[in-house]
Amino acid sequence: MLSDDQITELCTLALRVEDHYETPQDIEWGLEGGKFYLLQARPITTLYPLPESWRGRKDHRIYISLGHIQVMTSPVSPMGRSVLSLFFPFGRPRKPGVYNPLLAEAGERLYIDITPVLTRKFLRKKYTGGMKGVDFLMGKGVEEALEEPGVLEGILSTEKKPKIASAFPYIKGILPSVVKGILTSKPLPRREKIVSGLETYLSSVEENTGGLKGAEERLIYLRDELENFVFKVLPLLGVLFPALIIRSKIRGKIQEWVDSDLDEEIQAVERGLEGNITTQMDLETGDLTDRLKDLPMLAAFFKESGMDIGALEKGRLLKGSETFYREFDRFMEHYGFRGLSEIDIKNERWKDDPKALLQIITTHAESEEKGAHRAHFYQLTKKAEEAVETIILSVRNSAGGRKGVSRSRKMRKMLNLFRCYMPLREHGKYYLMKLFSIIREELLDDAEQLCKTSVFRGTDDVWFLEYNEMVALAGKLDSGYVFQPEEIKDLQKRIDSGRSRFERFCDVEPPRVLMGNGTIPRPSYSSEGIPEGALIGMGVSAGVVEGRARVITDPGEESLLKGEILIAPFTDPAWTPLFINAAAVVIEVGGTMTHGSVIAREYGIPAVVSIPGVTESVKTGRHIRVNGSRGFVELLD
């Protein structure tokens, strides 16, 4: 039996071990001659870590995973987290260089403190409902957290309600665009004007950055642009929000005005949307595939060479490759700043490492018919146009007379606005990634200078510091400051600690929702009406398909053959060229309006998302049936 003093001593030892490894440890100990001995320590992998700032707090708080919202659940580097914290506008003080206090790190991921939003009843209902569209299990998890005894009462009694006035700058910036977007009789020129304005803005940022002399000055300028980026895209959001509202309103009005079932037509209207920047990127990827089909020697060279940046440059020497490279260079000019898991600024872009892109192009060149991607998209566009006319005619005929004519005009306007503005859904992230690319290049340039002074051992050291730390280091570089050995040693120790922690959490699955007391809600789907043994998720693109599963966790290492069903942990724009070959898509995370879901609908392929652990439950080669209409996957053999 241990005495109280011995228990205190043992707890102190356990805390020292936890502090040393920076994560909770399962320890084995021995007691000999009144002295404790540590025999073994290993991480407690069943516990998800809480940030230091949450520990000891008595108030009730609820946090949601930013990674699940962005459909990228891998760890995010310290630099990546700090950049996102500077960008994330809601709740951040309007002071330069201040990180957002509503964002906190847990397990090398970012979590959003949504507690302030939950204090207002109307926001609480809207927010949890909206979250289900982003990730159903996340929204349900928040609902379950609020149902825990004393949680909502605790939030309402301790948390200050957010001031409505804090939303005024956003309302002021977005409202004119909303009004103009809805009232205009020519939505396409309105859309083109918004896109042109964003192109001009990003070009000016790049030009202004190049005109600044000091590294510190450039980093501060880019930080200012990052912090104010949301105000630059408010006109874009001003026409996108009405499109999202119109989407549900179209369905509601059809149900109210029309007797017949028009579900197929409604689904067709959401497909073949011209102007979506990601769809355009995918189509141009298909064009590159067509060029490569005419150059079998170049395709074979890519496959044999490992498809790295060096092989890409050597391929230019092959006879006849000029046509491919002319188109490839144009593609990289528009999309080279995209990449896998791109919300972490640490991760390489296609222009740094084209392997994932070349992998997709060379695989498609073997299986895709020439021009098939363009023909498929044309058919989707044509069917969408026909569906628009069918819906309008049905609305007119259902009421008849003047009422029918009036309703059909309203429906036509709603459909036109939806199909014109909805393609802008991907543009905000496209331009944010363009800004990230400019910042990334500056950080790497500064890291190279720090390598020359032996402060950094490699340029990738920069990713394990925070942005404001780099601003301070850049100021010292500009002034010719001589770094002292102890100073360098301390800095490198901090970098090593950040790197070690990042690597340690790579294989840890982050929860969708966290409560401040460490509780993790684990909601589930209803199995009513679902076949026994089926994997239940959320149907986001209608249709039923049977086929061979292909589990892909890294598009740079694995490829999808024509007609296979893609099983993925998550998808971002760098993944979607794979959708060209996919018969259906199944993803571990996501909701109705997340990236993969929208692209699946536009391509007209069935999709089910938000199935936790599906990349483990389904193995490559397994014969499965995907029901995108009802939201489940059946294992057939």
Explain the meaning of each model-derived region.
Residues 60, 66-79, 490-577:
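Protease-associated
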Residues 10-20, 24-25, 33-49, 549-564, ...:
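Acidic, glycine-rich flexible loop/linker segments
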Residues 1-5:
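ATP-dependent carboxylate/phosphate-activation module, predominantly the ATP-grasp catalytic core
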Residues 53-59:
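Short intrinsically disordered coil segments
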Residues 6, 439, 589:
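Charged, low-complexity surface patches
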